[in-house]
Amino acid sequence: MEEQQPPSIKKKIVDFLTNFLKKRPSHEDLRRDNILVAPNNVSPAIQPSRYELEGHLNPSSHNRDDSSNNNNNNNNNNNTVEYSRGHSKSHSRSDSKHHNRENSKSDRDNSRSDNIRFGRKDTFKNAWDYLRNIDFTFSKTKYGNTVVHRLKHPQFGLSPEELQSLYPDQPHGIPIVLTKCFEYLSKHLETEGLFRVPGSNREVSLLKFKIEDGDLDFSEVLIPYNICGLISTFFKELPEPLIPFDYYNDAILITKLGSKDKYIIGLRDLVLSLPPANLCMLRKLLEFLLTVEKKNEFNKMTISNISIIFGVTLLKDPDTVDPMKSLNNIQAQSTIIKYMLEYFNDIFKEASVVKAYRKSIVPKEPMDTTSISYLDPAESNGGSPRTSNTPYQQQHQLSSQSMANIKPRPPSRSKMMRETIVLSPRVSGGNNQVYANATMTRPMSRLFFDPEIIPSPPPTTTTTTTTTTNTTTTTTTTNTTPNNTTTVNIQQKPVPPKPNLIPRKLPPNPNYSTYPAPLPPRQPNTIPLAPIPPPKPNSTYKKQITQPPPPRKPTSPSPPIATLKPTSKSDFIPSTNNNLNNNNTTTTTSSLISIPKAKPPPPKRNNVVSPAIEEPINPNLNINSTTTTPTPPLASFKNNGTISSGSKSNPNLQNLLNTNQPLVSSNGPPNKPPPQPFELLKSKPITTTPTIKKGVTFSETPKISNSPPSPSSSSPSPPHNQPIIVNKPIPSKSAPPPVRTTSSPSIVTKKFVPTIPTQTTTASSSSTPTTPKNQHLSKDDSSIPPINTSQTNNNISNSSIPSPKSKSALSLSTPKDSITGKPIKPPSNSDLSISTTPLPPTSSSPTSSSPLQSPKISSPSVLTVSQKIALNEKIAANQAKKNPLSNSGGLKQISPDLIKSNNINK
């Protein structure tokens, strides 16, 4: 058994190495899965090798090493290795399917080795354990669907910037793997064919695994060619060439310049344009290659040979991926490296390049996130070299002798109001050290900078003529600086008390005029509102109404005029002459100069005054004290109970009430203000009778005599004497209007006979004129010549107020001679004078005694169309038999309307 064990162990090692090397993921797969990039919150550092061969060969430290290895295995791959001397060893391996290992055979081999003593064949066992740890380093851990390759210290496949950020402590600003390789090859410079003779790919892969696992000891490497292959592998696996793709075309153009000076200038500009990490790595590589070239007598590696080897590695054509197609560019690529090596001092020893190189060596300080203490800057005082040796602390860490009597100077801050808050009174120096090393700034509280809450106390002047308040009982020192900062410094000997959040109230200094007196604390809603001063009294009424509120839509109809009640001493009778010709615009009404209310009531619709009208107002008006706008002077009540209008053309109120006609038309838009009072006075009267274009006019007034009108002959009549027509016929467009007549006793008796004022002129003016019932002429009536009106059957003719549709509703009557009773010869159409001006509907009464009485009011008869046609035909036939008409005897042609009217009346 013991003789067969070594072959099985050897076979197991060989099988493991064979499968492991074949199944390792390629570099492209690792880069695609973003495996080699360390997390951002981790700042790893190069550690010494954990798996040294001496530790495995040492029996005393074997158990301790195994326990540490087991912990690492549990953290990385959830694998457990239990191994102890003199006891059975059970080995459970996970993720074996990823590497296609022979688990069953390995388990059988492990079961066979349970009875083997630890002292036998320790070299093979320790080697197996060592290789197994390397296997765990590159084993896969599956988290859901993501496969993570655990790499302790990745070196290959990372860009120079990533390597500098991951390993800030690396010497010379280059990865430590290059540093170790350069150190090893510097001892074997006389070896012939360095970088030209390839190394073993198997050895290069094992070295790469070993380096990324943390073992950088090359003392056991016997072949320098393997180290040269390791350097070439490092540059070949970079994500981009050391001279990036963006600079490839510029580099190729340099080779076509044709002179040494142009080569140097072009290459110098190319080097300065490279990223800092690439510049640092390129210079260190070229320095080492020049060292190799110095031993070219032994190693046979000249500049031409080196440039051919590294030209393809450091420069790659971005347009050609296939290496066979890029053979044409090999000469240009090698020429660039050749010129860099030949003119190294002229390129890299220039001042600008040296300055850029020095900047590239010093990387940015990484933040150690391995502990939560990085959130508290007070924890980093003197313990970490990156914080204890910063230039800021070296500048502000003064000696005890200089800090004894010198006022501390706060560090430069931004213009924002900030304060220094000491998180912990840590002191890393002796007893005389004044400053704490760790402070954190944050925005100052509003409590210290709001003068309305707490006033700024004036600084007390001391004998040292500074603005510092020095006390012996406290350890806080307040410094007034121009940028409004407050620095709190902690001294060492006295115990630092807790900061007092409530500042003391100091009495104000009356001699210091720049600081205001202390104000009481702010109270919410205690500022009274400023009273609104009353407006100045206006002397004119026009200024009071210059800006009225906008008109609002009416919410309720305006009250009718019938609801007005007569008031004593406030009855107003507007005068047309005074209202139109008055130039005095001054009023002394008390309501015009009253103090405006907080919210005045909305104006009425009938009382809105347009601001564009600047017509003066009659001072004789008695304006109601409740409103500031005058009431429209439409009509007023007098003591006699009648209604008098302001002008000759005002309509009769009773007729308006009988016809249910509104005073102001509501057909307009709702927001249009009603007409003004003086506009109503000047406007034409509201007529209810349309104009008849033909020779007959339907009049609403009684007969008019031919005597000249006189103002004394017209007087208003009481409204109770006005005849009211009820049961008016419904007008129709298609049918003729009904005829109201009393001339035919067979049809109806005691009915009204609406007649027209026959405006005919006679040759003789000796006829006795009759006194009219009412003489109310419009402006156009003065041009009408004297007319002769006849009375028929002593009946008063009056008409009702027709609607606009009943334009043809006419009642015709033929005038007769008062002496003979015969019909008067009607004049011709040329002699007939027609008044086209509508007469206003007025209520009239006789001015003198008249035997005529008011007729009785009854419902008029309505004749249908067929009845009127039959009646007209019958009357016309009878009349034709009795009095045949002829055109002789001085009579002119009679109009058909007069003939029809004559026949009907007969």
Swiss-Prot record:
Single GO MF annotation: GTPase activator activity
Localisation per UniProt entry: Cytoplasm
Gene3D superfamilies, per the entry: Rho GTPase activation protein (1.10.555.10)
Polar residues composition bias: residue spans: 381-404, 565-574, 637-649, 880-890
InterPro entries: Rho-GAP, Rho_GTPase_activation_prot, RhoGAP_dom
Major site of localization recorded for this protein: cytoplasm
Stored PROSITE patterns: RHOGAP
Name used for this protein in its record: Rho GTPase-activating protein gacJ
Species this protein is from: Dictyostelium discoideum
Native organism taxonomy: Eukaryota, Amoebozoa, Evosea, Eumycetozoa, Dictyostelia
Gene name as annotated: gacJ
